[in-house]
């Protein structure tokens, strides 16, 4: 919103860095937009932010639809069309325009044929999008309300962040007037100088100002390190849902809970979350319960981690380099656990060996007396005893093999 001495001007744009973009609009750094370059409209103020888009393309789609409500296919125009709003005078003007067109009948056949050929060669130019006819703040908020309720955008994990109290108040007034409400998962955050105490607004997610909006991936660095460490070598790991081992180039996701190491196929988890919603029209889930820890996790957060891990490139390398100390700590903890398990196994082997070596301490005479003096019943019991011991060892070996292959927890 431009707050210069002229009438307040409104501008809708898209940016990955709100603080930098606001400085560009105010001429503090290179960049900006042509419509915000007028010094008489400066300084510009960012009154609200729609955030939570899954990609840059998604943000641009929403931006274009909000800028061109009369042309977008996501909105139904409330205003009557030109054909319905024509006055009697306008109809007469159209008839007057049509009359000269009848003179073309007097053209020669050759001239008419030439014009038709020229028209066939000309390429049809794409019409520019219809301009916005309403430019007030109220009109912009009404269009935003319609977009958030549209079939295409209502399933997106978006949130509204208000930095101006008057804009937040007008939005609440609009929501109270409209019969239909926006989806409940779309959050409203009262930030900046907003003193909104309504239950719809969340103050806990406030950052204070536009400059404090986080634009990097620092909040999910620990989550990214854990996922990269768990899926570094996918051989031997398996999906917690379908119980199948991963193969190369499998899309796997990791539970964002700090104490959970659950990994699943992307499609397996998506199908599980969608089945739990019982909504056949939903294509992308929003939340769901982890199959291992049963905690409710956010699908957009998991997709953000997956995108950085698979397409981050240098960004991923730098984040993991900064977090290398924590990764080494995790590795040491796992090594210590493995070492303790090895020590326990070695102790068990030593105990078994001590029992077996106890027979070697007997003298040769005692040994032959015990063997020759034993009857068939005692021999049968000895055979049964050693047979059961061998069976138990075999079961333990099979269990260890399954653990190595990742088939058991």
From Swiss-Prot:
<keyword id="KW-0540">Nuclease</keyword>
<dbReference type="GO" id="GO:0017108">
    <property type="term" value="F:5'-flap endonuclease activity"/>
</dbReference>
<dbReference type="GO" id="GO:0033557">
    <property type="term" value="C:Slx1-Slx4 complex"/>
</dbReference>
<dbReference type="InterPro" id="IPR027520">
    <property type="entry name" value="Slx1"/>
</dbReference>
<feature type="compositionally biased region" description="Basic and acidic residues">
    <location>
        <begin position="80"/>
        <end position="90"/>
    </location>
</feature>
<comment type="similarity">
    <text>Belongs to the SLX1 family.</text>
</comment>
<dbReference type="InterPro" id="IPR048749">
    <property type="entry name" value="SLX1_C"/>
</dbReference>
<feature type="region of interest" description="Disordered">
    <location>
        <begin position="76"/>
        <end position="135"/>
    </location>
</feature>
<dbReference type="InterPro" id="IPR050381">
    <property type="entry name" value="SLX1_endonuclease"/>
</dbReference>
<dbReference type="Pfam" id="PF01541">
    <property type="entry name" value="GIY-YIG"/>
</dbReference>
<keyword id="KW-0863">Zinc-finger</keyword>
<keyword id="KW-0862">Zinc</keyword>
<keyword id="KW-0539">Nucleus</keyword>
<feature type="domain" description="GIY-YIG">
    <location>
        <begin position="1"/>
        <end position="76"/>
    </location>
</feature>
<dbReference type="GO" id="GO:0000724">
    <property type="term" value="P:double-strand break repair via homologous recombination"/>
</dbReference>
<keyword id="KW-0233">DNA recombination</keyword>
<keyword id="KW-0227">DNA damage</keyword>
<feature type="zinc finger region" description="SLX1-type">
    <location>
        <begin position="239"/>
        <end position="293"/>
    </location>
</feature>
<feature type="compositionally biased region" description="Basic residues">
    <location>
        <begin position="122"/>
        <end position="135"/>
    </location>
</feature>
<feature type="region of interest" description="Disordered">
    <location>
        <begin position="325"/>
        <end position="345"/>
    </location>
</feature>
<dbReference type="InterPro" id="IPR013083">
    <property type="entry name" value="Znf_RING/FYVE/PHD"/>
</dbReference>
<dbReference type="Pfam" id="PF21202">
    <property type="entry name" value="SLX1_C"/>
</dbReference>
<feature type="compositionally biased region" description="Basic and acidic residues">
    <location>
        <begin position="106"/>
        <end position="121"/>
    </location>
</feature>
<keyword id="KW-0479">Metal-binding</keyword>
<dbReference type="GO" id="GO:0008821">
    <property type="term" value="F:crossover junction DNA endonuclease activity"/>
</dbReference>
<keyword id="KW-0378">Hydrolase</keyword>
<dbReference type="InterPro" id="IPR000305">
    <property type="entry name" value="GIY-YIG_endonuc"/>
</dbReference>
<keyword id="KW-0255">Endonuclease</keyword>
<comment type="subunit">
    <text>Forms a heterodimer with slx4.</text>
</comment>
<dbReference type="InterPro" id="IPR035901">
    <property type="entry name" value="GIY-YIG_endonuc_sf"/>
</dbReference>
<keyword id="KW-0234">DNA repair</keyword>
<comment type="function">
    <text>Catalytic subunit of the slx1-slx4 structure-specific endonuclease that resolves DNA secondary structures generated during DNA repair and recombination. Has endonuclease activity towards branched DNA substrates, introducing single-strand cuts in duplex DNA close to junctions with ss-DNA.</text>
</comment>
<protein>
    <recommendedName>
        <fullName>Structure-specific endonuclease subunit slx1</fullName>
        <ecNumber>3.1.-.-</ecNumber>
    </recommendedName>
</protein>
<dbReference type="GO" id="GO:0008270">
    <property type="term" value="F:zinc ion binding"/>
</dbReference>
């Amino acid at each position: 919103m431009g707050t210069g001495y002229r009438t307040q001007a409104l501008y809708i744009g898209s940016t990955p860095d709100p603080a930098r973009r606001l400085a560009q609009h105010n001429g503090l750094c290179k960049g900006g937009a042509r419509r915000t370059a007028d010094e008489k409209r400066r300084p510009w103020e960012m009154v609200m932010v729609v955030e939570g888009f899954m990609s840059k393309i998604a943000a641009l789609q929403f931006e274009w639809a909000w800028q061109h409500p009369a042309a977008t296919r996501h909105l139904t125009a409330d205003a009557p069309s030109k054909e319905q709003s024509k006055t009697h005078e306008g109809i007469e003007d159209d008839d007057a325009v049509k009359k000269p067109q009848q003179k073309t009948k007097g053209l020669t056949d050759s001239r008419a044929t030439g014009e038709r050929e020229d028209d066939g060669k000309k390429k049809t130019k794409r019409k520019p999008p219809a301009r916005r006819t309403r430019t007030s703040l109220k009109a912009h908020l009404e269009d935003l309300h319609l977009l958030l309720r549209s079939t295409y955008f209502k399933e997106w994990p978006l949130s509204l962040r208000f930095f101006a109290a008057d804009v937040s108040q007008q939005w609440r007034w609009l929501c109270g007037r409209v019969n239909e409400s926006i989806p409940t998962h779309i959050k409203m955050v009262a930030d900046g100088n907003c003193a909104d105490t309504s239950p719809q607004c969340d103050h806990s997610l406030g950052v204070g100002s536009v400059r404090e909006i986080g634009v990097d991936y620092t909040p999910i660095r620990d989550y990214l390190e854990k996922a990269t460490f768990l899926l570094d070598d996918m051989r031997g790991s398996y999906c917690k849902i379908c119980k199948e081992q991963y193969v190369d180039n499998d899309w796997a996701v990791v539970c964002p809970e700090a104490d959970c190491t659950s990994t699943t196929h992307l499609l397996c988890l998506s199908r599980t979350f969608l089945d739990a919603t019982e909504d056949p029209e939903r294509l992308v889930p929003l939340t769901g319960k982890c199959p291992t820890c049963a905690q409710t996790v956010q699908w957009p957060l998991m997709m953000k981690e997956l995108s950085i891990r698979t397409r981050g490139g240098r960004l991923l390398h730098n984040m993991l380099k900064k977090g290398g100390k924590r990764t080494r700590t995790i590795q040491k903890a796992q090594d210590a656990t493995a070492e303790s398990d090895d020590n326990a196994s070695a102790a068990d082997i030593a105990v078994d060996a001590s029992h077996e070596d106890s027979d070697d301490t007997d003298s040769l005479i005692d040994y032959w007396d015990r063997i020759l003096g034993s009857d068939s019943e005692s021999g049968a019991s000895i055979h049964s005893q050693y047979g059961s011991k061998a069976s138990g060892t075999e079961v333990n070996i099979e269990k260890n093999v399954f653990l190595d292959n990742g088939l058991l927890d």
